[in-house]
Amino acid sequence: MKNFKFYLMAALVAATTCTGFTSCSDDDDAESTVNPATRVVAETKKYDTAILLCTFGSTYNESLDVYNEIIADFRKQFPQTDIYMSFTSRTCIGRAEASTGEARYKLDQWLKAIGDAGYTRVAVQSLHVIPGEEYLSLMNTDIKKNFMIDWYPHIDVLKGANLLSTDDDTDEVAQVLYNHYKDKLAEKKNIVLLMGHGNPDVNYNANTKYSEVQ
């Protein structure tokens, strides 16, 4: 788990160097009876363990490049493991496909393809920063209820928490961000502005994680 946390922190620093931000909302696309992720997983599978990285997603190419770097880092650190990534926003999936020409699949398609591929152990690592409603829906509904209970109860599953899940995590991330930007902040004319997606309810307790980092 500490390895996961370390690479989440590294990913956060990489992501903050990207200049683009986007707001994606879910839509109700027509579902196909054929799961296109099945073929991808079947062709990729080399080991008995898989890691599925889950992120809300983005429509900016700079951010998509960062995701590719995150995947490469995980493959380097977990060489005996197959690594996959899924966006949880369907709108981000569609827009990323349109801008890059690269096929991307919905979360349930990845989960079913991985579950049917014969893996004995699956780790689902959230790349969400705060434990907001998107993260809770992922872990409580998509992973726990659907994947672990209803679909594949025989698979050993590890759920990796979001980046700012504990007070210690918050302190470490704040220190990483400070160290990354301190040289630029030495000049009084410079400021650093970090933006997060947040939650629609301003009273949602996960939103306080941002002020805690500050």
Q: Model-derived features: where do they sit?
A:
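Hydrophobic helical h-region of N-terminal Sec-dependent signal peptides
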Residues: 9-17
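C-terminal motif of bacterial Sec signal peptides marking the signal peptidase cleavage site
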Residues: 18-23
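Bacterial N-terminal signal peptides that target proteins for export
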Residues: 1-9
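Extended amphipathic ligand-handling, pore-lining, and cofactor/metal-binding catalytic surfaces
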Residues: 25-214
